[in-house]
Design a protein with these regions (language model features):
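Extended, hydrophobic alpha-helical segments in both membrane/secreted and soluble proteins
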Residues: 124-127, 159-163, 330, 345-348
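Short coil/turn segments at secondary-structure boundaries
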Residues: 1-8, 84-92, 111, 171-181, ...
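Contiguous, well-ordered alpha-helical segments that form the cores/surfaces of helical PPI scaffolds
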Residues: 40, 119-134, 150, 219-222
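Internal maturation/activation junctions in enzymes
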Residues: 65-112, 116, 138-217, 225, ...
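Structured mid-domain segments that build the active-site/substrate or prosthetic-cofactor binding neighborhood
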Residues: 1-122, 219, 249, 428, ...
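A general alpha-helix detector
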Residues: 127-131, 147, 162, 473
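Catalytic alpha/beta core of large soluble enzyme barrels
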Residues: 26-27, 73, 77-85, 187, ...
Length: 473
């Protein structure tokens, strides 16, 4: 088993550090009661002169920041222990007897023991895909895989160096035993990469039982406006639509739907693709046609480097190369088309194992509902739709529910048009205001009627039945 054989904490399995499971995304194999703190370093931020011929990676600054990050992670463990102590103090102060609160108290004591004893950290990265593009290196290529391996080797050596340095100052994690780790493949790779670091570790120990991981960093990448984790870019550019009023000044109508509503199309750029455009003199304000967008992508370093373009086997091999320098694990997803064969999926799993991956996730398009939805999904001929088909043309009259709600300090009202008791459209506005929508508070339902003025502009009226049975619009 690759995890057990490569795991540094599993060298201490006899002391309770045998891996039994992982966190939900799989990047942290854990023993019972243990936990891990995660931190992600933005690789793109170390590329100087990105998207130019002078682009380079600042390894000097990168090494300094890796060391600082490891120090921060160790400090966070102490802060975490303070919080656990506060929880234990609260449990002790509670009026219930030990037979009631004993289980919870023992749980937190075990969590505290593992955190203090092993001091596990999880230094990771994000923006690997953007970093490679900014350097002019294609994701998934041999050059790209080699450079990624060098990056993660650097992280491993510098993070472990920082942990050894901190051990000199603060002491090693309490169960450190160099004899238990002497045959661990990861530790031996560190020895080969930097013998001085290895012998310093033999002399002083290190502060943390394990230090490295690569998480999905989905939310983190939204903050950094980069690709996530070790993944390539999903799409560098795509088009969206927004509804517009055709009578507004300077409005542009690109599409009119079946019910006569007008839409404007606009281009959404991946932030770093937009930066590439600006560096290379392409306008980011122009309304490009799809053909023009395709030509732009073809000129960019993101060409043939999206999640759908990258060769699946090469991606697995890249993960395996990087995994050699990550003492925990890596969260990676291989996106496959719906019609992929079982044989190919089997080959990917086998290749992942042979490449040295500790885990791999395969997602087949459409294999789970509500996860990812593609535009080209098709129903099988023998599949019967039990739901009423969604109308391609809006009925003139829709039943509607009325919902009143508070928006900060303002009172609002919403009219929800329904088809088969499911929301189809929503109109909202201020309520109980001179300029708002005046409607008796007892009205909870009615009709939304679509009409056209003499000038052809659509309008929507709400109609309800008053207490005397008369229709009011």
């Amino acid at each position: 088993d690759t995890i057990i054989n490569e795991s540094v904490p599993d060298c201490y399995a006899d002391l309770g550090y045998k891996t039994v499971s992982t966190n939900p995304c799989g990047e942290i194999p854990l023993c019972p009661y243990d936990s891990c703190r995660l931190l992600a370093i933005n690789l793109f931020s170390y590329v100087e002169n990105p998207f130019t011929k002078k682009a380079s990676f600042n390894f000097k600054l990168f090494k300094e920041h890796v060391a600082a990050a490891q120090r921060i992670m160790d400090d966070i463990i102490d802060l975490e222990l303070e919080k656990v102590d506060a929880i234990l103090a609260k449990i002790d102060a509670d009026p219930e007897g030990n037979e009631v609160k004993g289980v919870e108290r023992n749980l937190w004591l075990n969590i505290r023991k593992k955190a203090e004893e092993g001091r596990r950290t999880g230094i990771g990265i994000t923006a690997e895909g953007d970093m490679l593009a900014a350097l002019g290196i294609q994701y998934g290529s041999k050059e790209g895989n080699n450079f990624s391996e060098e990056i993660h080797k650097t992280i491993a050596v510098e993070a472990y160096r920082a942990s050894v340095y901190t051990a000199k100052e603060r002491g090693a994690f309490t169960i450190f035993d160099s004899e238990s780790e002497k045959d661990n493949p990861f530790i031996l790779r560190l020895k080969e990469a930097d013998e001085k670091l290895y012998y310093d570790m033999l002399e002083h120990g290190r502060r943390n039982i394990a230090l490295l991981t690569i998480a999905p960093t989905g939310t983190t990448s939204l903050m950094t406006q980069t690709t996530s984790g070790i993944e390539p870019v999903f799409l560098p550019v795509y088009k969206r639509r927004r509804k517009v009023n055709p009578n507004d000044k300077n409005v542009r109508v690109d599409f009119v739907d079946e019910v006569g509503d007008s839409w404007e199309e606009y281009v959404v750029f991946h932030h770093r693709f937009k930066e590439w455009m600006e560096v290379n003199g392409f306008s980011t304000e122009k309304n490009y046609t799809q053909k023009e967008l395709d030509k732009l992508v073809k000129k960019s370093p993101y060409y043939k480097a999206t999640s759908n373009d990258v060769d699946w086997l090469n991606k697995v091999r890249m993960q395996g190369a990087v995994q050699k320098w990550v003492d925990h694990s890596i969260s990676v997803t291989i996106n496959l088309p719906n019609d992929v064969s079982e044989e190919l999926v089997g080959n990917l799993y086998l290749e992942a194992w042979q490449a040295g991956c500790k885990g791999v996730t395969v997602y087949r398009d459409g294999s789970r509902s509500g996860v990812l939805i593609s535009n080209d999904e098709k129903k099988s001929e023998d599949e019967q739709d039990t739901l009423t088909p969604f109308p391609t043309k809006r009925p003139e009259i829709l039943e509607a529910d009325v919902v009143r709600f508070q928006n900060n300090k303002d009172k609002w009202i919403a009219f929800i048009g329904l088809i088969d008791d499911k929301p189809y459209e929503i109109f909202t506005g201020l309520a109980d205001d001179e300029d708002g929508i005046l409607l008796p508070r007892w009205v909870e339902e009615g009709l939304i009627i679509k009409n056209r003025n003499q000038d052809g502009v659509s309008r929507y009226d709400f109609q309800f039945e008053n207490k005397r049975g008369y229709k009011t619009t």
